[in-house]
């Protein structure tokens, strides 16, 4: 299983939200690149970046910080938030981002996502509230089931699906393993769990369930998960 520590960018700072609410943002660092460097030192291969301002604005908003992270770290970077066109995808890949996460656009224009996945390293982000897909920075809930959206991309050439249970995001109440497995089953793709992870109990449960990867956010920042121990456990498997 792959562990992807997360950095959420808001107004140039590293923050965490609770349940996706912008007003709940808690600042953890004024220098996000230093956080990424720390993840690298702890043994991470990947960092999961989210441009929160971009997710709401529909265009890149934290470019300087993203550049700084790329310049200062040798990690693989995946990035989501505000990516709505091919020009933005190319720009980020030219910057050295390894793969890009398409979320809201996957609901609104699945054909576009298929076209992009045929050309570029693309991950689909499926965010759900009570099993229904949430879009536009989680500000709106669609009438589409998350599992139906996952099926849509089964043969589209995307690298993975990141599925977030919005109700658990930043709450450290445990990962929704059943939801993650349902997405994996529907798509047949590598599936990464996001939202709710708290400690090693969750890491072990995810490994046991055969989940491919997990995003680690608040559990690291609040100190409930020892990331080094988590990497050791995963690598021992």
Curated annotation (Swiss-Prot):
Q: Which GO terms describe its cellular component?
A: cytoplasm
What lineage is on file? Bacteria, Pseudomonadati, Campylobacterota, Epsilonproteobacteria, Campylobacterales
Sorted UniProt keywords: Amino-acid biosynthesis, Cytoplasm, Histidine biosynthesis, Isomerase
Q: What is its EC number?
A: 5.3.1.16
Q: Which reaction does this enzyme catalyse, per its entry?
A: 1-(5-phospho-beta-D-ribosyl)-5-[(5-phospho-beta-D-ribosylamino)methylideneamino]imidazole-4-carboxamide = 5-[(5-phospho-1-deoxy-D-ribulos-1-ylimino)methylamino]-1-(5-phospho-beta-D-ribosyl)imidazole-4-carboxamide
KW Repeat (keyword) present: no
> What CDD domains does the database record attribute to this sequence?
HisA (cd04732)
Q: Where in the cell is it found?
A: Cytoplasm
Sorted alphabetically, which Gene3D superfamilies does this protein's record hold? Aldolase class I
Q: Which HAMAP family match?
A: HisA
Tell me what this protein is called.
1-(5-phosphoribosyl)-5-[(5-phosphoribosylamino)methylideneamino] imidazole-4-carboxamide isomerase
Q: Name one GO molecular function term.
A: 1-(5-phosphoribosyl)-5-[(5-phosphoribosylamino)methylideneamino]imidazole-4-carboxamide isomerase activity
């Amino acid at each position: 299983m792959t562990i992807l520590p997360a950095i959420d960018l808001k107004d140039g700072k590293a923050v965490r939200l609770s349940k996706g609410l912008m007003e709940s943002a808690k600042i953890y660092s004024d220098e996000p690149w230093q956080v990424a460097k720390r993840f690298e030192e702890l043994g991470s291969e990947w960092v999961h970046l989210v441009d929160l301002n971009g997710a709401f604005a529909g265009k890149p908003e934290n470019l300087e910080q993203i550049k700084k992270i790329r310049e200062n770290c040798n990690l693989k970077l995946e990035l989501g938030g505000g990516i709505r066109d091919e020009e933005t995808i190319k720009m980020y890949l030219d910057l050295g981002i390894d793969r890009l996460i398409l979320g809201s656009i996957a609901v609104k224009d699945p054909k576009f996502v298929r076209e992009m996945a045929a050309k570029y390293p693309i991950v689909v982000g499926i965010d759900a509230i009570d099993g229904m897909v949430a879009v536009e920075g989680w500000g709106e809930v669609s009438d589409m089931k998350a599992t139906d959206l996952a099926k849509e991309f089964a043969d589209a050439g995307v690298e993975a699906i990141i599925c977030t249970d919005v109700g658990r995001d930043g709450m450290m109440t445990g990962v929704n393993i059943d939801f993650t497995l349902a997405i994996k089953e529907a798509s047949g793709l590598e599936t990464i769990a996001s939202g709710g992870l708290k400690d090693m109990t969750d890491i072990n449960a995810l490994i046991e369930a055969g989940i491919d990867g997990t995003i680690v956010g608040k559990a690291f920042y609040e100190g409930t998960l020892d990331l080094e121990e988590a990497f050791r456990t995963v690598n021992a498997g």
